């Protein structure tokens, strides 16, 4: 029997597919739709210290090759999501989940994570170091010194399972530098990647979205080669205890297969989930299993990270 079961940290999942933070995860109702689908788990909207309305609309647009957005981290506040995942866990009948959070300053991040430490929640936390769409706030993980200092401080008080959502890197030296930092800490996972920041899509002489004069994060087909490169680069550089979640350009079982081939333990779906809804997980799971059967693979470990190079 072909299995797409996987593991992140000490958490086991019966499938390897889930939503990407930002899609189908704003409300409890949306999260429960993902929960009831064939997705392995869900990740919440990235929760900030306070409720955020996000950027002015229109702030999202589908395009021929994917999507562009400048949402600006709209969310119901981290406590809304923390209370929800904590309550779900208490029922004992639900999947392990991911709680996505970030502060708009190091002090806010510390306040949020200390609140999670003091809570009953024992699941996975994804710290978003890579949102490109908050005006005046840089993507933290592009500043290696700040990232190192932030993680060093976090792990003086935070002992629950924690991973980080990364922006795309484009330089081999940056892969080396980032991995050297991440390997210093007891991270459960890294998520590669968030959208490619500050793209521009034009239609009939006009930008598609309002914030930042049309500049926004690019997702979908545009990002898949970059996402695969980041997944594989970090798979080769990170210690085995740090699992990799692959995100970017996944709309078919073949796309998911390639992420796993590059080293991903789980795969997140964003743009196409927004377009098709949670039924996407059943289709992509079926397509992935078909590929595995054709190639003679019984489980993800049979091919994870086994990308072949040209001689």
Swiss-Prot record:
Which residues catalyse the reaction? 131
The residues that cross the membrane are none
- EC number per UniProt: 1.3.98.1
Binding annotation for substrate: 45, 69-73, 128, 194-195
Q: Where does this protein hold FMN? A: 45-46, 128, 165, 193, 220, 248-249, 270-271
Signal peptide (residue range): none
Q: Which InterPro entries does the record associate with it?
A: Aldolase_TIM, DHO_dehydrogenase, DHOD_1A, Dihydroorotate_DH_1, Dihydroorotate_DH_1_2, Dihydroorotate_DH_cat, Dihydroorotate_DH_CS
- In terms of domain of life, where is this protein from? Bacteria
Q: Please state where this protein is localized.
A: Cytoplasm
Pathway listed for it is: Pyrimidine metabolism; UMP biosynthesis via de novo pathway
Q: What is this protein called?
A: Putative dihydroorotate dehydrogenase A (fumarate)
Organism, as annotated: Streptococcus pyogenes serotype M18 (strain MGAS8232)
Gene encoding it?
Answer: pyrD
């Amino acid at each position: 029997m072909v299995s797409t079961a996987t593991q992140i940290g000490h958490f086991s999942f019966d499938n390897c597919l889930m939503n990407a933070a930002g899609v189908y995860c704003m409300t409890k109702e949306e999260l429960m739709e993902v929960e009831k689908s064939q997705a392995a788990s869900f990740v919440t909207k990235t929760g900030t210290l306070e409720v955020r309305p996000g950027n002015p609309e229109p702030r999202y647009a589908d395009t021929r090759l994917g999507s562009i957005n400048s949402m600006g981290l709209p969310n119901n506040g981290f406590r809304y999501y923390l209370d929800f995942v904590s309550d779900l866990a208490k029922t004992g009948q639900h999947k392990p989940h991911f709680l996505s959070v970030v502060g708009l300053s190091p002090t806010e991040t510390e306040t949020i994570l200390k609140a999670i430490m003091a809570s009953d929640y024992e699941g996975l936390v994804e710290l978003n170091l890579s949102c490109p769409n908050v005006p005046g706030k840089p993507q933290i993980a592009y500043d290696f010194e700040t990232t190192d200092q932030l993680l060093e401080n976090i792990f003086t008080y935070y002992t629950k399972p924690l991973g980080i959502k990364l922006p795309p890197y484009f330089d081999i030296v940056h892969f080396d530098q980032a991995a050297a930092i991440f390997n210093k800490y007891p991270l459960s996972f890294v998520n590669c990647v968030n959208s490619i920041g500050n793209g521009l899509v034009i239609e009939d002489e006009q930008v598609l979205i309002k914030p930042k004069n049309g500049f926004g994060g690019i997702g979908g087909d545009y990002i898949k080669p970059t996402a695969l490169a980041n997944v594989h680069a970090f798979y080769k550089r990170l210690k085995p205890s740090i699992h990799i979640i692959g995100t970017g350009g996944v709309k078919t079982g073949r796309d998911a297969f390639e992420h796993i081939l590059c080293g991903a333990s789980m795969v997140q779906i964003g743009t196409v989930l927004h377009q098709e809804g949670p039924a996407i997980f059943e289709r992509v799971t079926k397509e992935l299993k078909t590929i595995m059967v054709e190639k003679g693979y019984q489980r993800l470990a049979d091919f994870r990270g086994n990308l072949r190079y040209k001689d």
